[in-house]
Amino acid sequence: MEKLTRILAVANGIEDGALVLRKSVALARRFGAHIELLLFGLADDLEAATLCAVLAYDKVTVASMHPGVESTTDVILRRVFAAQPDLVVKSPAGEHPLKRWTLDDNDWRLANECPAPVLLVRHAPWASPIRFAAAVDVADDETSDTARSILHAAGFMALGCHGNLDILYSEREQHDDALRMERAEKLAQLVREFQVGCERIQVFDGAPEHVLPPVVSARHYDVLVLGAQSHQPALKNLLGATNSRLVQATEGDVVLVKAAGRAEGNGVHDESLREKRSYESEQFA
């Protein structure tokens, strides 16, 4: 994450739009970013314009979306590849009466295929200063690449928001001291690479999927930064289990970040280059 000049905010109706736009504007003010609001559902354009006026932020474009036969995720991805935002903001798609958070397959798919970080927001307001946490793993090359992207995004956002950042790492290796030291040095090197003066490394012992969720739950972070699920089957199961438990543990918002240069998809990127915009009518607020 090198910059934050364009935010793509996605909402399903006016009520959801109020939540998503409020937090998008809170970030945009800090970075001077432009917001494009994709408004799905039977939304009233006048209500959307009024909402933008109430927030008193004039760098907002409102687009009423009518996806037709396409899935909402396909429409979002098509717009992402066309507009190339630096951040996508939306509320989580999944719901469960017994869980704080539930991300459905569409959320995970969006995070895996979207080249920009995806911020999933809930109703809880942010503290001042904002409390960020980044959960990382440096067990091998792929998880280290993801950790680098996580620290880059988390450090950039924390610095721009004048927030606090905790870096959470749990070492699952309990016997090989040389391997433990190698990973500790790798983590320290990554932190130095993205040093912004406000982060704290916190190292725990044990399997991260068991150790870190209680830590996250007890500390009430405003924003938790995680890696999107891996495309390699073995790591996908491992990272998916850890991330799912961390997502369920937090009361705050979640940023899902993909390793730099990793792209997954089903052709939506190529289709976006054909300027297929018949499903969209744009207005300015």
Tell where the protein language model's regions lie, with residue ranges.
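Short acidic/Ser/Thr-enriched loop-to-helix initiation segments
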Residues: M1-E36, T102, N112-C114, P125-L168, ...
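Charged docking surfaces used in two-component/phosphorelay signaling
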Residues: M65-V75, F204-E209
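Gly/Ser-rich helix-loop-strand patches that form or flank binding pockets
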Residues: K3, D74-S128, P214-R277
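Glycine-rich phosphate/pyrophosphate-binding loop and the adjoining helix
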Residues: N164-P208, P213-P214
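Short, charged/polar "capping" segments at the starts of alpha-helices
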Residues: G17, A43-A49, E142-S144, H175-E182, ...
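A glycine-rich helix N-cap at a beta->alpha junction
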Residues: Y57-M65
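Residue-level recognition of beta-strand->loop/alpha-helix junctions
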Residues: L39, H66, Y169, Q202-V203, ...
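Flexible loop residues that form catalytic
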Residues: N12, A43, A93, D137, ...
